[in-house]
Structures are given as structure tokens and as C-alpha cells.
């Protein structure tokens, strides 16, 4: 019996972020492809207009865990929904992105929680 697309989607949907990262790396190695987004060149005269647009998607980066690593791990778990081991691995591997492609309010709240826990964080 073959696995259906729905079964694959359900399996991927139940994976943790760290497991998904490993899956993407395995696909890249097996099929010789890259999951990196391709850069698209905009129209030649759009450079001035692009600077005037407000950024709508932000990435929260954990730069440094600081002295109170336990509190930072708790904050990362709260922000991302990761398990204890995944959150600890993420904090130990800093600097790393914690949340990607989120709105400004969510990004600022996540940064505030990380800084209150004693970490150094930035928005990009």
C-alpha cells in the first residue's frame, strides 16, 4: 500500500522544527537541491520605491543566551512551542533565528520575552 499525500502532510505537520530542519537537509543531500529562496531581480526603477515601503515580516534572532540560560530556554519554549531538548539545542547554538516571517507586534513581543529572560535578541 502506497503512502498518500495526506499521510505525508500529516506526518510533516506533526514534526518539530528541529526534525523539519533535518528533513530539509536530508532532501537537499539526496536530491542535490537547495531549499534557499532564489533572489528575484526587481524592475530597474524600483530601488527608490522599495526603500519607502515599510517592512512587514520580521525575524527574531537570539544573539546570546546570557547568564540565566534556564530562563532563556523557558522563554524560547514559550515563544516557539518547542520541546525542552529542542529549545536547549537552539539556545546552545546561538546566534540563531527563533521566529521567522512574523508580524512586527509578534516579533517585538518575542524579543521582549527573550530580553526579560536575560538574552540578547534582535529583529531583522
Curated annotation (Swiss-Prot):
GO molecular function per UniProt: mRNA binding; structural constituent of ribosome
Pfam annotation, one family: Ribosomal_L12_N
Ordered alphabetically, the record's keywords are: Ribonucleoprotein, Ribosomal protein
* Region feature (Disordered): 102-124
Q: Which GO terms describe its cellular component?
A: cytosolic large ribosomal subunit
| Record text on subunit structure and interactions | Homodimer. Part of the ribosomal stalk of the 50S ribosomal subunit. Forms a multimeric L10(L12)X complex, where L10 forms an elongated spine to which 2 to 4 L12 dimers bind in a sequential fashion. Binds GTP-bound translation factors.
Keyword match Ribosomal protein: yes
Function according to Swiss-Prot or TrEMBL: Forms part of the ribosomal stalk which helps the ribosome interact with GTP-bound translation factors. Is thus essential for accurate translation.
Tell me one GO biological process term.
translation
Q: Which spans are transmembrane here? A: none
The organism of origin for this protein = Polynucleobacter asymbioticus (strain DSM 18221 / CIP 109841 / QLW-P1DMWA-1)
- Xref: CDD domains: Ribosomal_L7_L12
- The source's domain of life comes to Bacteria
| Protein name in UniProt | Large ribosomal subunit protein bL12
Q: Which gene encodes it?
A: rplL
Q: Which family does it belong to?
A: Belongs to the bacterial ribosomal protein bL12 family.
Amino acid at each position: 500500500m502506497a503512502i498518500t499525500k495526506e499521510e505525508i502532510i500529516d506526518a510533516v505537520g506533526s514534526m518539530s522544527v528541529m526534525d523539519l530542519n533535518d528533513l530539509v537537509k536530508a532532501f537537499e543531500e539526496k536530491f542535490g537541491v537547495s531549499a534557499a529562496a532564489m533572489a528575484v531581480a526587481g524592475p530597474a526603477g524600483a530601488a527608490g520605491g522599495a526603500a519607502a515601503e515599510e517592512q512587514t515580516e520580521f525575524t527574531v534572532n537570539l544573539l546570546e543566551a546570557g547568564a540565566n540560560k534556564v530562563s532563556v530556554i523557558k522563554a524560547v519554549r514559550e515563544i516557539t512551542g518547542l520541546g525542552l531538548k529542542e529549545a536547549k539545542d537552539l539556545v546552545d547554538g546561538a546566534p540563531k533565528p527563533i521566529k521567522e516571517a512574523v508580524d512586527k507586534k509578534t516579533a517585538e513581543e518575542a524579543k521582549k520575552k527573550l530580553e526579560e529572560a536575560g538574552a540578547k535578541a534582535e529583529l531583522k
